[in-house]
Amino acid sequence: MIKVKVPGTTANMGPGFDSFGMALDIYNEITVEEIESGFEMLQEGELSEIPLAENLIYTTFLNTLNKHNYKYKGFRINLSKCDVPMSRGLGSSATCIVGGIFAANSIMGNVMSFDEIIKEAVSIEGHPDNVVPAIVGGMTVSIMDKDNVIYSNVTVPDRLRAFVMIPNYKLGTEEARGVLPDSYTREECVFNISRAAMLVNVMNNGEIEKLRLCMQDKIHQKYRGALIRNIDDIFKKAYEFGSLAEFISGSGSTLIAFIDKDNNEFYDRMKNFLDTLEDEWTVHLLKPNFTGAEIIKNR
């Protein structure tokens, strides 16, 4: 039996649209067992709503085996732990893709190199900002050079924590991309480029007091924010309670506030405020994950 543990991720992180991502200590775990014949996919909760042919764990796992002409009898696949919610902007699809590839590669005797795993995962996901940190951990900046994925790790300050706010409604990537404009002004592009560059340096230097300025954005958040109820009030309260910066996680609907680990009152104060809103919000106070995806059982 093989068990793969994959962290959820937050992507974009303000100005880093489709490029920046960070792994968080919230996880999905996938268990794979060999059986005599056929495929069994144990699907529970939100996953049970997805047809097998559209299940990213199943399709990625099977396609990876077939691509390498691996001969097999059958497998039972189970999403044995599902803490990363679907379609909420925390990289749920990346956990499924990465988990499927890692499980298949382990079964095949680790025939794929690290770079091959990353390239395959990005080709399925379509963009690198979630899958790269899910694989390597930490904060990453990723770019595409034709079919090649180039990434670099960014140092995350020890004091940084992510207060994650997950509403009880989904926001699909397709819908969230659909509200974005087809073009941007030069001023808007320069605004984001300068802040994205500054954000990397601020992270590397541990200058968390500068995060608010660096995480401003004019490319996607003002458009997607219209799809998330009470976002302005939530961000205003987070600022009032001492947040370092607030942003939409991925394409939404999850919101994140970066806080200093010593801000001991933030969790309770923010949760109490969210409880007054009409939607139900699940909250987590998370550290960055620095290990990325890993095989935690192989026997």
Curated annotation (Swiss-Prot):
Q: Which reaction does it catalyse?
A: L-homoserine + ATP = O-phospho-L-homoserine + ADP + H(+)
- The primary site where this protein sits is cytoplasm
Q: Name one Pfam family in it.
A: GHMP_kinases_C
Family annotation (Gene3D superfamilies): 3.30.230.10, GHMP kinase, C-terminal domain
What are its GO biological-process terms?
threonine biosynthetic process
Which Enzyme Commission number(s) are listed? 2.7.1.39
Where it sits in the cell: the answer is:
Cytoplasm
Q: Name one GO cellular component term.
A: cytoplasm
Alphabetized UniProt keyword annotations: Amino-acid biosynthesis, ATP-binding, Cytoplasm, Kinase, Nucleotide-binding, Threonine biosynthesis, Transferase
Query: What enzyme category does the UniProt record give?
Result: transferase
Any one GO MF annotation of this record: homoserine kinase activity
**Parts forming coiled coils:** none
In its keyword annotation, does this UniProt entry include Flavoprotein?
no
Family per record: Belongs to the GHMP kinase family. Homoserine kinase subfamily.
Q: What does this protein do?
A: Catalyzes the ATP-dependent phosphorylation of L-homoserine to L-homoserine phosphate.
> What is this protein called in UniProt?
Homoserine kinase
Taxonomic path:
Bacteria, Bacillati, Bacillota, Clostridia, Eubacteriales
